[in-house]
Amino acid sequence: EEYAQANAVIAPPKAWGKAVPFGWNSWGALQFNLTYPKALEVSDFYKENLQSHHFVNSDNLVYTGLDSGWNSFSEEALKAFVDKCKANGQVAGVYWTPFTDWAKNPEREIKEMPGYKYKDVYLYANGKPQELDGAYAVDPTHPAIEAMMKHTSELFHRAGFEYVKMDF
């Protein structure tokens, strides 16, 4: 929280001038069982059964979002999901937590910055990684995390996502 507040002093948050994002996020039903075919099926279900019955926000939009498991999709599959959502009149979204290590595997290499392992980027207190809600916190200012954030943000942009939800 303190890191976010300090950043807000330097770069205030952008105002959201649109209606509340409303729709579906894969975590609620699929959790760790998200697959590409299931994501497409949900987009089609919303299009065929719900959108025409006013299951939209005040901007007449539905947000269809991928949660945990999107990283098992190829870049081509992510783009195809976005294209499917657009064709179905939806805004494609994705959820990402770049400031945590859910695997809690200190020896795992950070693929976007070879030579660094997750133990190099953990936030420590009294020599122990700091854990919250089942994940280890990572240093958002570490060059390896910055490289990971740049790489993943560019992937989302190339795939065409219009909505990215991030948690600290």
What is each stretch, according to the model?
Residues 47, 59-69:
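N-terminal start-of-domain structural block
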Residues 1-54:
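Carbohydrate-recognition beta-sandwich/jelly-roll modules
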